[in-house]
Amino acid sequence: MSKPFFSIIVPAHNSAAYLPVCLRSIKNQSFKDYELIVVADACTDNTAKIANWYTDKIIETNYGRDGLARNVGIDAAEGDWLLFLDDDDWWIHEYVLDRLCHFATHTDADLLPFQFIWPNDAHGRYYWDHAKYGINIAPWSKMYRRSFVGDTRFSDAERTSDEAFAYGLIDKIERGEGKWFFIHELYYYYNYMRPGSQTEVHSHEQGTV
């Protein structure tokens, strides 16, 4: 059996109320050559059961850290390219994987950041373009060549887990071991306003390069 083009990794923690929206945005993609890996981490609800409606590749862990859960997903991934979604976020249309496949096959880049949008209760919505505002360290805002990631992993520190992964890969590029390509297209909805979300706790939008 051939390996998938994409491995999509979703760390999930007690997200039964939100996970279906996330996973439906993946299942609704017109491009189907992918594997979906849900890492149900330290869950006390029926997150794993809900995930089972969408994929048979579910890994249950008890770390209580989204970075370590992502590491488990990376280790299990078989695809040529890696993508991450947080359990309460979603892709904004059904052609995201089609577009990402296009850029993966028409560039020689290893790390490809794309635009995302998030809500703000005072000012409506904001969007992030890495080329304009700096490289945001959020792992879900990029596509990664699996061979380029290699043994780079997230740390076990709650507040700096994403930094370890992002800066490890940026260092590789600065050493000439990989290439960027900035995608000026909007793909990702970052559900920052959901109380208790992974992204709200870790304030991804604060970290830029």
Language model regions located:
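Conserved donor NDP-sugar-binding/catalytic core segment of glycosyltransferases
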Residues: 94-126
